[in-house]
From Swiss-Prot:
Coiled coil: none annotated. The lineage of its organism: Bacteria, Pseudomonadati, Pseudomonadota, Betaproteobacteria, Burkholderiales. It comes from Burkholderia orbicola (strain MC0-3). This is Phosphomethylpyrimidine synthase. HAMAP family: ThiC. Disulfide bonds: none annotated. InterPro entries: ThiC, ThiC-associated_dom, ThiC/Bza_core_dom, ThiC/BzaA/B.
Length: 643
């Protein structure tokens, strides 16, 4: 997209690649108890099994869909107008918010009055911001603790279930072998959940709205849903739900425009980003964020200290509580769903980093450490934490308590500074919960595999099971350019142990700002890690997609293999590099083994022979061996023959 500001406002558009439906997929909606609860899912159509393999019907499978209206051909996409306000009616019906006459942050008012920003501003519908009425608390946690099941909670329950029960029923009615097929496709290995909800191997275990409410009330899950982001589709972050992933985007002082960041957001959610963090540190942070939020169907997170630092020209020592407070209100009124706040970086912990290999690597952590040292005072984030809670509960902004002292190398993993901060984050969690403010805890970082579980166990203990949100962790430091892999290994492990959301890492980590291709690579890598964790935990229905793809692979349904996978485009591209013809899409082999050495084709031949002989597959193999033994003796019982 052209970076020219005038072009942006006049002709801004979404990338065509981000709105095209995925192959053999369509957007479907499942309606809840009221007509305006319409939960999106992606339906993947499958071909029938070839006659030679049984000829049964393969019903569509349903997968979690984060792409919002962008992949719905019936939706009118205009990023200048933004997305429909999906939750507006639910928010209004609760009767506990008020519409403000205008912006109440000083900086927001200044930007709105500045003629230099006119061409950069979001041109769509300008709703006045909402805030809780005096004395009211509008957080999803508050409602949950009052015993209220909100529409958001019902929406989430439907979304997490992914129509598993309907899929199994459709298998049962697919033909004479339907019951057998349903049992096979619904089979799932028991998981090891490390104290999380024990669903076992029950693929049909249902996530109910009441279960969602209870998990939020306990603080074990959060629903990031600012009342000023009504465009968002409700989702949940907690270890008893599907593991989620976050994608980071954002401009810097040296690269990227507003248009490019909107493109990255729509691209990230196409491939499975459950939330997006705008980490912009360059020009026009306020305007960039407005465009992103108004066009985002997923929760948006930020690190407010980044923008506060820009307001004091990059001088950390000039930061004040008043500037930071105004920044929180500014962003809350725009609709940011969760704030990363590094309130655990206390003055007493800063000296503990002196002997580290890589010091303080968190931007937010280093900003607050510098402020503490410059003033030799306790962090104003820590000192004013209760006041921050008052702001959060007025808009339902969730805390993402930042790990400002996370290790930046495996050398520094699990050291005194990191664990001291984690203990403080646990204390702050208890304070936030007194205000019914939702909390998740950020985690490392760089941690070798043998130390990962200790991180998870300490977090569960000290933070009382508040959701854990980790960056990786990276399990080795030797692979610049491949840190999506070094971190994907750690992400799969810590997701299995109980982490609720994984922050993606792209191949550009430590090297540069990611482009769209890097964003996709990071997303797919982390979707894979999250799914592997769901399988290992034994999450209900986690294996359905694996079973469907494996069946398609065994039956040489190549198109279904591509389409059920996380990245149909890459799978098709790799296959077509060596077998590009359409005939290869129905062939009973690939270029790996060729037509004569395909193990799956050989297995099919054994099954066909068994069916012809009216014997079991084991007996068929035995008969085949006997025939070959007779042939061996008749030809002279020689191992080798001259040609």
């Amino acid at each position: 997209m052209n970076a020219n500001p005038k072009f942006l406002s006049a002709d801004a558009h979404v990338d065509a690649a981000a709105v095209a439906p995925l192959p053999n997929s369509r957007k479907v909606y499942v309606t809840g108890s009221q007509p305006d609860i319409r939960v999106p899912m992606r339906e993947i159509t499958q071909a029938d099994t070839p006659t030679g393999f049984g000829g049964e019907k393969n019903p569509p499978i349903y997968v979690y869909d984060t792409s919002g209206p962008y992949t719905d051909p019936d939706a009118k996409i205009d990023i200048r107008a933004g997305l429909p306000a999906l939750r507006q009616g639910w928010i209004e019906a609760r009767g506990d918010t008020e519409v403000l006459p205008g912006l109440s942050s000083q900086y927001g008012l200044e930007r709105a009055a500045d003629p230099a920003t006119a061409d950069l501003r979001f041109p769509g519908l300008h709703r006045h911001p909402r805030r809780a009425q005096p004395g009211k608390n509008v957080t999803q946690m508050h409602y949950a603790r009052q015993g209220i099941i909100t529409p958001e909670m019902e929406y989430i329950a439907i979304r997490e279930n992914q129509r598993r029960a309907e899929y199994i029923e459709s298998l049962k009615s697919s033909g004479p072998n339907g019951a057998k097929l349903a049992a096979m496709m619904g089979r799932q290995h028991p998981g090891q959940a490390f104290g999380a909800a024990a669903f076992g191997a029950n693929a049909l275990a249902e996530i109910t709205p009441e279960f969602v409410r209870d998990e939020v009330a306990r603080g074990r899950a959060i629903i990031p849903a600012n009342i000023n982001h009504p465009e968002s589709e409700p989702m949940i972050i907690g270890r008893n739900f599907l593991v989620k992933i976050n994608a980071n985007i954002g401009n810097s002082a040296v690269t990227s425009s507003i248009g490019e960041e909107v493109d990255k957001m729509t691209w990230a959610i196409r491939w499975g980003g459950d939330t997006v963090m705008d980490l912009s540190t360059g020009k026009h942070i306020h305007e960039t964020r407005e465009w992103i939020i108004r066009n985002s169907p997923v929760p948006i997170g930020t690190v407010p200290i980044y923008q506060a630092l820009e307001k004091v020209n990059g001088k950390a020592e000039d930061l004040t509580w008043e500037i930071f407070r105004d920044t929180l209100i500014e962003q809350a009124e725009q609709g940011v769903d969760y704030f990363t706040i590094h309130a655990g970086v206390r003055l007493q912990y800063v000296p503990l980093t002196a002997n580290r290999m890589t010091g303080i690597v968190s931007r937010g952590g280093s900003i607050m450490a510098k402020w503490c040292l410059a003033h030799h005072k306790e962090s104003f984030l820590y000192e004013h934490f209760e006041e921050i809670c008052e702001i959060m509960k007025a808009y339902d902004v969730s805390f993402s308590l930042g790990d400002g002292l996370r290790p930046g190398s495996i050398y520094d993993a699990n050291d005194e500074a990191q664990l001291g901060e984690l203990k403080t984050l646990g204390e702050l969690t208890q304070i936030a919960w007194k205000h019914d403010v939702q909390v998740m805890i950020e985690g490392p970082g760089h941690v070798p595999m043998q130390l990962i579980k200790e991180n998870m166990d300490l977090q569960l203990d000290w933070c009382k099971e508040a959701p854990f949100y980790t960056l990786g962790p990276l399990t080795t430091d030797i692979a610049p350019g491949y840190d999506h892999i070094t971190s994907g290994i750690g992400a799969a492990m810590i997701g299995w142990f109980g982490t609720a959301m994984l922050c993606y890492v792209t191949p550009k980590e430590h090297l540069g700002l990611p482009n769209k291709d890097d964003v996709k690579e990071g997303i797919i890598t982390y979707k894979l890690a999250a799914h592997a964790a769901d399988l290992a935990k034994g999450h209900p229905g986690a294996q359905v997609r694996d079973n469907a793809l494996s069946k398609a692979r065994f039956e040489f349904r190549w198109e279904d293999q591509f389409n059920i996978g996380l990245d149909p485009d890459k799978a098709r591209e790799f296959h077509d590099e060596t077998l590009p013809k359409d005939s290869a899409k129905v062939a009973h082999f690939c270029s790996m083994c060729g037509p004569h050495f395909c193990s799956m084709k050989i297995t099919q031949d054994v099954r066909e022979f068994a069916a012809q002989q009216g014997v079991s597959e084991t007996e068929a193999l035995k008969k085949g061996m006997e025939v070959k033994a007779v042939e061996f003796v008749k030809t002279g019982a020689e191992i080798y023959h001259r040609q």
